[in-house]
């Protein structure tokens, strides 16, 4: 069974946490992780691109010249695609790029990235993150006490940590999520994971 050190908010060590190998100790599947990251990045795209076809471009209501007798090719509108200032043919329309992968694939990707962080020593467990009020400075002290210098993803329990979330929201390089909301993209993008002990239990309940 994999084990990680358990720390207190002040940075002192409180013991060790034994992790479930079926969640935090599997052989990472890089191909599945790649597929899920691409899927989640696609879901983030706005997809608000749009073009104007000949019916949407302003003007062009009058026939530029008569149908016959001029020697020139017949034209019905100056907003036809072949005209300068005319409409666009087969241009982009607003759309959603989101698509879903099977649940088992997403879960395997989550277990793979969690296992990678544990193997690399980049998962830090903390017994609790309790704050009497939302204070950014207090959360910054926790980050400093745990010697976290680069981008960190803080994983909180699913409920009851509103002050911790509000305290971390304004810190640079700190992103906060919950046990059920942590995404593969968030975990891969973070240099380290700071996970509350009760959140570890909730993660294992879902993925084991």
Swiss-Prot record:
<keyword id="KW-0699">rRNA-binding</keyword>
<keyword id="KW-0689">Ribosomal protein</keyword>
<comment type="function">
    <text>One of the primary rRNA binding proteins, this protein initially binds near the 5'-end of the 23S rRNA. It is important during the early stages of 50S assembly. It makes multiple contacts with different domains of the 23S rRNA in the assembled 50S subunit and ribosome.</text>
</comment>
<dbReference type="InterPro" id="IPR013005">
    <property type="entry name" value="Ribosomal_uL4-like"/>
</dbReference>
<dbReference type="GO" id="GO:0003735">
    <property type="term" value="F:structural constituent of ribosome"/>
</dbReference>
<comment type="similarity">
    <text>Belongs to the universal ribosomal protein uL4 family.</text>
</comment>
<keyword id="KW-0687">Ribonucleoprotein</keyword>
<dbReference type="GO" id="GO:1990904">
    <property type="term" value="C:ribonucleoprotein complex"/>
</dbReference>
<dbReference type="InterPro" id="IPR002136">
    <property type="entry name" value="Ribosomal_uL4"/>
</dbReference>
<dbReference type="GO" id="GO:0006412">
    <property type="term" value="P:translation"/>
</dbReference>
<comment type="subunit">
    <text>Part of the 50S ribosomal subunit.</text>
</comment>
<feature type="region of interest" description="Disordered">
    <location>
        <begin position="45"/>
        <end position="89"/>
    </location>
</feature>
<comment type="function">
    <text>Forms part of the polypeptide exit tunnel.</text>
</comment>
<dbReference type="GO" id="GO:0019843">
    <property type="term" value="F:rRNA binding"/>
</dbReference>
<dbReference type="GO" id="GO:0005840">
    <property type="term" value="C:ribosome"/>
</dbReference>
<dbReference type="InterPro" id="IPR023574">
    <property type="entry name" value="Ribosomal_uL4_dom_sf"/>
</dbReference>
<protein>
    <recommendedName>
        <fullName>Large ribosomal subunit protein uL4</fullName>
    </recommendedName>
</protein>
<dbReference type="Pfam" id="PF00573">
    <property type="entry name" value="Ribosomal_L4"/>
</dbReference>
<keyword id="KW-0694">RNA-binding</keyword>
